[in-house]
Amino acid sequence: LYTIPTFQNPTGIVMPMPRRKKLLQYCNEMHIPIIEDDVFRDLWLDAPPPPPIKSLDGHGNVVYISSLSKCFAPGLRLGWLVGPEAVVQRLADVKMQMDYGVSVLTQQVAEELLRTGLYEKGVQNIRSQLTERRDFMIRLLERYFSEFAEWSVPSGSFFVWVRLKNRVSAEKLFNLALKEKLLIMPGGVYDRGHSSS
């Protein structure tokens, strides 16, 4: 089972702790491994999110993945995973076959950022900017869209999931927005089962 329980893309939803526990319990009972993608964790704006599902994992059933790319530096293509040793070893082998591993320089830059506190300082600055941008976006939505749409104020990351009250051609809306230099992603992009309206 693959999940983004913290600031899920595209909805921005955070899975509450009781649901995390219930999901882990169910997957343990059914022998279903969990891949927890937690790349947005450090982009909380209002309050830190619940601990990762991996922190509750006493059976080695969760593979936890994260990265510096989403929260800090998109160009710093470095990620990591935590999981059972056999899984980690196998995935490391696959990674080596694909691209011979991550640059040593990239790893040294990441180590320096994390060791010196520069990462946390930078993320605090990013959180501050994201909070301003989120608040600005919500003000614009309230001012211009409140009669046409509904949304939730995200508590982290950079996603605002907007639900239109009336049926609209998502493709047409996408193209009109693009002409105004505004990028929106229709919900159907994220779900094969939904139509483009």
Question: At which residue positions do the language-model features occur?
Answer:
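PLP-dependent class I/II
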Residues: 2-197
